[in-house]
């Protein structure tokens, strides 16, 4: 049987799909009210805890200015907070191991981004658009036998 509709509004309401609510994300906090996440980059692994505060950053028990002396590394570290407009709103406690300073800074950035999303799930879209939630999978290529390095061959002599 064909239904009869007296107006366009009736037709619209009959054919409209049921609206779905946006998924509701929940904060993931520990007993001290901190969000935790792990970040990785090259060989470095960073464990990051964040809690609301004044913007104090402690890396391996030292101030961030001492541990990451180069300003570029500190800038990499602060990028997620800058994009999310949350500079000086969170205290960070970080333990990082493995790799060099550049890889460690990248690992902290990755972990901080994930911890921010755990604390404020609505920041996920902003941080994902900037690429901070994506693990940078580039690692050092292994050395092959018969070669000097991963790709460089030994010097060749014709005679």
Swiss-Prot record:
Gene Ontology terms, MF aspect: RNA binding; structural constituent of ribosome
InterPro entries linked to this entry: Ribosomal_Su5_D2-typ_SF, Ribosomal_uS9, Ribosomal_uS9_bac/plastid, Ribosomal_uS9_CS, Ribsml_uS5_D2-typ_fold_subgr
A GO BP annotation: translation
Superkingdom of the source species: Bacteria
Gene3D superfamilies membership: 3.30.230.10
Protein family per UniProt: Belongs to the universal ribosomal protein uS9 family.
A Pfam family reported for this protein in Swiss-Prot or TrEMBL: Ribosomal_S9
Keywords: Ribonucleoprotein, Ribosomal protein
Cellular component terms (Gene Ontology): cytosolic small ribosomal subunit
Name recorded for this polypeptide: Small ribosomal subunit protein uS9
């Amino acid at each position: 049987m064909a239904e009869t509709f007296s107006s366009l509004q009736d037709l619209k309401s009959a054919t409209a799909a049921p609206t779905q609510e946006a998924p509701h994300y929940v904060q993931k906090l520990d007993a001290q009210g901190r969000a935790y996440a792990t970040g990785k980059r090259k060989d470095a692994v960073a464990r990051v805890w964040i809690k609301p505060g004044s913007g104090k950053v402690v890396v391996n028990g030292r101030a961030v200015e001492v541990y990451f002396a180069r300003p570029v590394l500190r800038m990499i570290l602060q990028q997620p907070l800058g994009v999310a407009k949350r500079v000086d709103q969170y205290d960070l406690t970080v333990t990082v191991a493995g790799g060099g300073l550049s890889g460690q800074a990248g690992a902290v950035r990755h972990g901080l981004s994930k911890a921010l999303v755990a604390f404020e799930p609505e920041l996920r879209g902003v941080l994902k658009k900037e690429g901070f939630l994506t693990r940078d999978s580039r690692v050092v290529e292994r050395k092959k036998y018969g070669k000097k390095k991963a790709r460089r061959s030994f010097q060749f002599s014709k005679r």
